[in-house]
UniProtKB/Swiss-Prot annotation:
GO terms for cellular component: chromatin; nucleus; RNA polymerase II transcription regulator complex. Its main location: nucleus. Signal peptide: none annotated. This is Transcription factor prr1. Residues 7-111 bind DNA. The keyword Cell cycle does not apply. Pfam families: HSF_DNA-bind, Response_reg. Involved in oxidative stress. Transcription factor that acts upon trr1 and ctt1. It is found in: Nucleus. The modification Phosphoserine is found at S223. The modification Phosphothreonine is found at T221. Residues 251-281 are annotated as: Disordered.
Amino acid sequence: MPSSNGSSDFVRKLFNMLEEPEYRHILRWSDSGDSFIVLDTNEFTKTILPRHFKHSNFASFVRQLNKYDFHKVRHEEGAPSIYGEGAWEFRHDDFQLHHKDLLDNIKRKAPSKRNLANENTAPVIENLKQQVDSILDFQKLLDRNLSGLATSYQTILLKMFELKRGIESRDLLMSSIISYLCDLEGSTQRQANPGAMFVPSHPLQELLNAYQALAKGQVATTSPQQIPNQIQQASAATTASSKMTVDTNLGTAQPSLYNTPSSDYELANQEKPADSMASAASLNTPLSSNDHSLNPHAHGSYPMYEKFQPIQHPNPGSFTTHLDSNASMAKSFSQISNDSLAKASSVATSMSQMGAAVPTTGLWKRQPRILLVEDDELSRRMTIKFLTSFDCQVDVAVDGIGAVNKANAGGFDLILMDFILPNLDGLSVTCLIRQYDHNTPILAITSNISMNDAVTYFNHGVTDLLVKPFTKLTLLQLLKKQLLNLLQADNSINMSDVPSTKEAKDDKAPVTFYLENDAPMYPQQMLQDPIQADLQHPH
């Protein structure tokens, strides 16, 4: 019968078989009676195991004996067994001949501590697996939520950018209206009393004071904001493309609203930000070639206009649109003198000669790093070929978002960018870059550009223009102009060949842009920084 600690039927059955003479030729007691011997393991496996024990092989029977603490008797090494070569002898202290009463002491061994530990750790391991699965599921949920938050964040950024552009457009419209009112009132006063100095009326002065106070408050709370690298996500790229396209269409539909600098980029770089905001009133004055009386500068300098300072480009080493307060703003492009055009042509000719004389190797103190943003493969290959021949390191972006990401990484000496790009247009890219980088020159590659477009580009952070199609020499001259700090001393541009600022003022015929055969020409591509220009609206 089985005991409380394990069944002893196996032991009793084995003892009874040893008592029977039927199996003595296979299984018997030892001569001393304190052990038993399996004489023939093969016969034991074939005859006894299938009939009396539930074991299929002798090894399983031996394992069963070990569970009841039977041990195999090992003879001295090399000594033959007295019961034959294939005999197996097993012993247990309570398994002896004629001592059946001791069989109750033979119990099945308790599981080892190792097995017990394994059994105890199984539930723990299963519990840990469940916890890991729960953590993985929770992580997936967090990833989905984070992705949604990132998308929402990008959408909010674009909405904020659109709102900012809308506020800028509103401010420019307000400044244009105020400027028009000033001109209208000044014209009325001059018609009544031509020799009198213009003094704004009380309502107009209150309007000007209120606008200046509003401008001061906006400048005080405005600061450049970093554009994050999350724009590199492909999902946000599509959103950015559609949003910026709408934004660009807004700027195209209302070109008059972008005729003066108004972004945070320009405001943050003014010594007198309040005056800079107020100066929009004088810069947005509507001009007509047939009516010069609306322009106060044509009739002397009035105190109200003297405090409106021209907005300067934040990079003094790059191209800037200069305004000469002593020149007449009533002059239209059709009235530019032949002497002015000849002077601009002489500057371009002298610069072309100097550029041709400079070799394209050994130009730089170190290799300039250029970011080229161009989606057209043919133009990109040609420009890269030119730049590498000038010993420049070139990195390439093929769309607007890629350009923002690479510019955000920094380390570029100059950005050469086509303004017709996928995902983000060049103007939007420039506005984004200028919010955290005010110094790197940005050269716009463009063609068929109008005067309003050119002014818009400069007002929003573009340093200079490179008009298609351009030559290798033109590109080299523009690089030398914008990267003067990297030029070797013997390759520096000779400033004596360029008319001085004083001479330009005395001639009163400075030229920034002029039109030839309905196509804009840009002498400032060569070297126009020392020349102050009058921006005039053509007919």
